[in-house]
Amino acid sequence: MSLTAWSWTFLVGYVGLMVGIGVYAKQRIKHADDFATARGAYGPVFLALAFAASTASGATFLGSPAMSYEWGLSTVWLHFLYPIGVYVGILISMRLVATSGNRFGNRSIPEYLGDRYQSDAMRLMVSLLSLVLFFYLAGQLVSGVVMFEIMLGLDSSWALGITALVLLVYVVLGGAHADILTDGVQGAMMLALAILVICLVALGWGVDGGFAGIVDDLEQQDPVLVAPINPNTSLFHSWWSIFVIAFAHLPLGLLPHLGNKLWALDTSKSRFQFVKLAALFGLALGMLGLGGLLARVYFGDALYADGANPNQALPLLFIELFPTWLAALIGVGVLSAVMSTADGLVVSSSQIIANDIYRRTLAPKMHPNLSQQELDGRVLSISRWSTVGVLVICAVMAWSLMDVNVSLVVWIGVGGMMAAFAGPLVLGALWRGVTLKGAYSGLLSGFTVFIIIHSQILEPEWFIGVGLDGAVAWLRGEGPNPYSCAVMGEIVSVSVTFIVSKLTQPLPEAHLQALFSEAQQSTGGAS
């Protein structure tokens, strides 16, 4: 059979499996909290697979190999350091977030922050800020469309419709249970492909001299491709750009679509095992980008030609190396990466509407006399309808951004929130002295600094009179590097949070004692 025929065969099987899991997950939904968090329902191994799959996105199969194809060995820093940053961030933060979130009965990261700082306004502010993740979800849908077009020969409208419809069916049915169950299965498939790619590169498959032959070939094409830093890209052009990779990703695992999975872990005693396994799986998935090095050896600079694209590096490598049926599996791998990130975004976004806005804000004012059972039923219904609304909105956004480079827009959402969360969420998990005003200040300052630097709106000539034109020129040069911008935003967020907290009214001691003593007891019990 042809590549298209095999791709269709695998697609039908994949869609059937995802929908089947959604139907099964629906049976596990007893109330709204099940839909939102699947609290305490999964062990560390399966949840680690699901978490690692959600952390990876369509870029893991397309963008990361493309960077290795274009920039060579300097990109290994990214593949290795970003998973380390993510899981170190989880390790230092999850003690308080998981323990307190379970005690409060939180269903979202915005709700957790509202309870952590005893502020409805904080919850609403973070909820509204989280809406920028719609751009991230739209970007995932676009990645799915690209894969359908390449592997199945579909036009954009059909590709977008199928991607959104599959997501809609299984998430509406099973909520967080469907999210985690499908992500665990998809994570296992992605991990198998990652191990295959790592072995291919390590052995230098089909290249004389093995891995050393890959390095020699890259050096012959361009010596910069084997240098530890690459001056041709702002992502890896200096040791600063390498340093920021791990630190930029520290808050990533606590963004709303990932952080809510921490509450699905079955027991606090499994936390360290969960983090170790998720880090191991995440590191393996990160190494998928190495496939771009082998693709550069096989194809040279052919993917720069008209009609080609470096994003095709890994799919074309599979087509080159393997039988048609096996090459078609890369399409399922990319689709798994897209769906495993997108479904978490859909669930967390629906909870902004159903939980953070309706249950915690509107319902107490509009329906104060509702019983808990009636309220729960309404929240569950709103969760499902919100899922439909979120997907429709993001599909429209994806359609409008189809011919646009969405990386800047996506990173305004992801990088901006990572910068914003560094103070109130990460520092707030380590230091009991963070105040409400400190959290507000850190949240807004980190987000604002990221946007200002990443959008490159500052002009050096504006600052010649005060002698800062050189510093501003450097900041402007760092603008295209989202990791550098995120770290600078995170530094500002943490610094402002600390300074303002030192100068403002602390939270009640009884509240802090309950938060941190319980987290410490939980850690002690798990050791």
Each predicted region: which residue ranges?
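Membrane-embedded helix-loop-helix hairpins and adjacent transmembrane boundary segments
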Residues: 1-527
